[in-house]
From Swiss-Prot:
Protein family: Belongs to the cytochrome f family.
Organism of provenance: Panax ginseng
Cofactor stoichiometry and binding remark: Binds 1 heme group covalently.
Chain's gene name: petA
Range of residues in the leader sequence: 1-35
Location within or outside the cell: Plastid, Chloroplast thylakoid membrane
Record-level GO BP terms: photosynthesis
Cofactor: heme
UniProt protein name: Cytochrome f
InterPro entries: Cyt-f_TM, Cyt_f, Cyt_f_lg_dom, Cyt_f_lg_dom_sf, Rudment_hybrid_motif
GO cellular component annotations of the record: chloroplast thylakoid membrane
Topology relative to the membrane: Single-pass membrane protein
MF-aspect GO terms: electron transfer activity; heme binding; iron ion binding
Annotated binding of heme, by residue: Y36, C56, C59, H60
Known role: Component of the cytochrome b6-f complex, which mediates electron transfer between photosystem II (PSII) and photosystem I (PSI), cyclic electron flow around PSI, and state transitions.
Length: 320
């Protein structure tokens, strides 16, 4: 009887341990997967500052190009494409968080005018779905459906990102008007150099925090270095920690200055931003334009016919 109780207790403890481990794994995985792509969402209410600068540039310090292509004009309640291109050399490899080299990822933020939003799945054509691929877009905030974010996604497959956009209808949204609107875009390739809390990633250059002589360089077991810098005047020692990834540029016994680079800059990526304009066109205006063009064409035709008729009359009078 005692043995059965003991076995039951052990079984219960094992079940609890497995359940706890599973819960920790799920929570950790969810936290990482949801937080990793969109650092900006955690610290900024709006991704575009009053100066026009997109906040992604605070972490991705290198300046790189980005391009956006949208139609010149769209009709109300219409699905259209906003194509964002993030060009880079596909042969490049970036430093990963563990210090190893890997392929670059890309990400983008698209800031649309108020009223414009991500198109519903049932409104997207099969051809557009094929161009979109397996991308999953999300709003920057539940209340900001006009700001869309994506990433990180594999750069080799998605250096060109197609956003399916639904234009608003002023007939149902009174705060939307038939006007020309700006669209802003930001796109990055590769990892950032600074985390949202201000700390450095391993994808940037590390500088000396003091001047002096490099006394000792210890290579860590998991990668990276501990560099001891000794001040020549008072013997004070400072230890600079270098994470795995950047290549060391100094050696023991070398004299260095304050803020001198201790490592190379491994960053091969960067961030860029751009803008475009789109006109929300009034269908009545389009119909009016078509009517005007048709009137001009008909007037030209009647003018030609009248001219030919006049020439025939003149010719008959001359023959008479």
């Amino acid at each position: 009887m005692q043995t059965r109780k003991t076995f039951s207790w052990i079984k219960e403890q094992i079940t609890r341990s497995i359940s706890a481990s599973l819960m920790i794994y799920i929570i950790t995985r969810t936290s990482i997967s949801s937080a990793y792509p969109i650092f900006a969402q955690q610290g900024y209410e709006n991704p575009r500052e009053a100066t026009g600068r997109i906040v992604c540039a605070n972490c991705h310090l290198a300046n790189k190009p980005v391009d956006i292509e949208v139609p010149q004009a769209v009709l109300p309640d219409t699905v259209f494409e906003a194509v964002v291109r993030i060009p880079y050399d596909m042969q490049l490899k970036q430093v990963l968080a563990n210090g190893k080299k890997g392929a670059l990822n890309v990400g983008a933020v698209l800031i649309l005018p108020e009223g414009f939003e991500l198109a519903p799945v049932d409104r997207i054509s099969p051809e557009m779905k094929e161009r979109i691929g397996n991308l999953s877009f999300q709003s920057y905030r539940p209340t900001k459906k006009n700001i869309l974010v994506i990433g990180p996604v594999p750069g080799q497959k998605y250096s060109e990102i197609t956003f399916p956009i639904l234009s608003p209808d002023p007939a149902t949204k009174k705060d939307v008007h038939f006007l020309k609107y700006p669209i802003y875009v930001g796109g990055n390739r590769g990892r950032g150099q600074i985390y949202p809390d201000g700390s450095k990633s391993n994808n940037t250059v590390y500088n000396a925090t003091a001047a002096g002589i490099v006394g000792k360089i210890i290579r860590k077991e998991k990668g990276g270095y501990e560099i001891t810098i000794t001040d020549a005047s008072d013997g004070r020692q400072v230890v600079d920690i270098i994470p795995p990834g950047p290549e060391l540029l100094v050696s023991e016994g070398e004299s260095i200055k304050f803020d001198q680079p201790l490592t190379s800059n491994p960053n091969v990526g960067g961030f860029g931003q751009g803008d475009a304009e789109i006109v929300l066109q009034d269908p009545l205006r389009v119909q009016g334009l078509l009517f005007f063009l048709a009137s001009v064409i008909l007037a030209q035709i009647f003018l030609v016919l009248k001219k030919k008729q006049f020439e025939k009359v003149q010719l008959s009078e001359m023959n008479f």
